[in-house]
Amino acid sequence: MGMRLSRRDKIARMLLIWAALAAVALVLVGCIRVVGGRARMAEPKLGQPVEWTPCRSSNPQVKIPGGALCGKLAVPVDYDRPDGDVAALALIRFPATGDKIGSLVINPGGPGESGIEAALGVFQTLPKRVHERFDLVGFDPRGVASSRPAIWCNSDADNDRLRAEPQVDYSREGVAHIENETKQFVGRCVDKMGKNFLAHVGTVNVAKDLDAIRAALGDDKLTYLGYSYGTRIGSAYAEEFPQRVRAMILDGAVDPNADPIEAELRQAKGFQDAFNNYAADCAKNAGCPLGADPAKAVEVYHSLVDPLVDPDNPRISRPARTKDPRGLSYSDAIVGTIMALYSPNLWQHLTDGLSELVDNRGDTLLALADMYMRRDSHGRYNNSGDARVAINCVDQPPVTDRDKVIDEDRRAREIAPFMSYGKFTGDAPLGTCAFWPVPPTSQPHAVSAPGLVPTVVVSTTHDPATPYKAGVDLANQLRGSLLTFDGTQHTVVFQGDSCIDEYVTAYLIGGTTPPSGAKC
């Protein structure tokens, strides 16, 4: 959320929300901070055990389930310099109610999303048998949410300003303007966080943090559930500590071996497929704002959203009316649409939003965009957007070849026309990572984890954010089991599908992997 978004940044951001469960969790949890029960928890020191205390919420309207415990764990910022700077990881734990096997540690991905908020959501739907046998544990990765230091680059005003602008001018002057905004964003990150911390926020270090959490919980081996980009954390842990894994479920896979540009284009195709599926469903109903012919849905969609940009100057916004004084910008109309495409449970909200836009009103799409961008009713953002950029930029090599970026823009316009404004100009801005001040700590590679126990990768056939093939590829690399879900949402474990939950519960408790070809 934060800097001027190039097409590459927009596509990369599509991993933000993890399925219908996340949509529910966001409504319930929002941008709260969950901390230990004392008014001010002292920051822990290296080597200290976690001091667990009853959790409390910064939002009085959000009730934390009874028995939830919170604490912090100190880890070195740089594991090669354990006497240097320290980070404090925020944790939440829901104790097992029966004969405990160990801890089930979860992460929702993003990257940059709060594992504490995710645990609050998963706790509501966790099967009773799993709750009996495991402590449910969530953690905010280094730099994220309630962990300290947290990555902050933009102010709330910065985010509102950037969202208000169309971000579609790919003329030579427009590209220069976008890249100047990007450089200013990078400068804010360096000024506020320092290069040393930014150099150590990547998943390679988060995997080491995860092992420190395992040890602090008293577990000899890790039992882990990762959603979306949380699968990247899981596969990194499996590579670094294959002998310390008891069980691992990876749902909505990110393939560490994927070429970054090709992965982004596959994500773009996934969202175009989701848009097409939505349009076909909408067309069955009288009054569909995209009309009765799904083949014309993209054309009709652009007739609704393109007028939000001044046709004579694509850097000028012509926002739709909203009760909020901000209005609905073109950028937020696209983001609100993407938010609704994560799950069919949100399609009716997209229909409502597009129906409003017919009358130049934008309240529903703005609300969806605010949910996606993590802006609360008081105009405050959490730090997930800034954290996501910082993590992505050290997790993969930057694309600095402008010819490749221009070719990606051309291909993306063909693959995902609903997200594409105007015509191909033959120019495109470099993404944020091209200007990042520290080098990446990881490169695309196939996962190698000799001695790893059987794992379970869950992949959804029409997942808009993490394509099905990524799950197939990751399962092959891990030599694990592939569990297929036939659906259109992003991630599925512990979200109400009894078939999926039976398979993963049997695996978590007894180690029984799904049979070859298992499908729900």
Curated annotation (Swiss-Prot):
This protein's GO CC annotations: cell envelope; cytosol; extracellular region; plasma membrane
Keyword presence, Amino-acid biosynthesis: no
Signal peptide limits: 1-30
Enzyme class, spelled out: hydrolase
Cystine connections: 55-70, 153-189, 282-288, 393-433, 499-520
Catalytic residues, chain numbering: 228, 463, 490
Main location: other
Complexes and interactors: Interacts with GroEL2.
Extra remark: Hip1 is an attractive target for developing immunomodulatory therapeutics against Mtb.
The protein's role, per its UniProt record: Serine protease that promotes tuberculosis (TB) pathogenesis by promoting the processing and the extracellular release of the M.tuberculosis (Mtb) heat-shock protein GroEL2. Hip1-dependent cleavage of multimeric GroEL2 results in release of cleaved monomeric GroEL2 into the extracellular milieu. Conversion of multimeric GroEL2 into monomeric GroEL2 is likely to be a mechanism for regulating GroEL2 functions during Mtb pathogenesis. Key immunomodulatory virulence factor, which promotes survival in host macrophages and modulates host immune responses. Impacts host innate immune responses by preventing robust macrophage activation. Dampens macrophage pro-inflammatory responses by limiting toll-like receptor 2 (TLR2) activation. It also dampens TLR2-independent activation of the inflammasome and limits secretion of interleukin-18 (IL-18). May act by masking cell surface interactions between TLR2 agonists on Mtb and TLR2 on macrophages. In addition, impacts host adaptive immune responses.
Name of the protein in its database record: Serine protease Hip1
Organism of provenance: Mycobacterium tuberculosis (strain ATCC 25618 / H37Rv)
Lineage: Bacteria, Bacillati, Actinomycetota, Actinomycetes, Mycobacteriales
Gene field: hip1
